[in-house]
């Protein structure tokens, strides 16, 4: 049985990116950095990024990733 409080890989990545302040082009993180900071397996990380990009929660620029304003709003909604 799954823990009802278990977060999806995409939500875990979203929260991790916020926690490491990947919130602008200047603080964007490369895939290797995200892999180090998250506890996600490689395939989970890539799938989570694909999902977050498709929803507009994450922006990719020159191989680095950061949260969009929408992604930041989603994280903030978790804490309020």
What label would you give each PLM region?
Residues 64-69:
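Minor-groove-contacting beta-hairpin "wing" of winged helix-turn-helix DNA-binding domains
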Residues 54, 71-72:
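Short Asp/Glu-rich motifs
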Residues 53-63:
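A short, conserved structural fragment
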Residues 39-54:
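Short amphipathic alpha-helical interaction segments
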Residues 1-23:
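Short alpha-helical segments that sit at the start of domains
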Residues 72-80:
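Short, amphipathic alpha-helical interaction segments positioned at domain boundaries
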Residues 23-37:
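Short acidic, hydrophobic short linear motifs in intrinsically disordered regions
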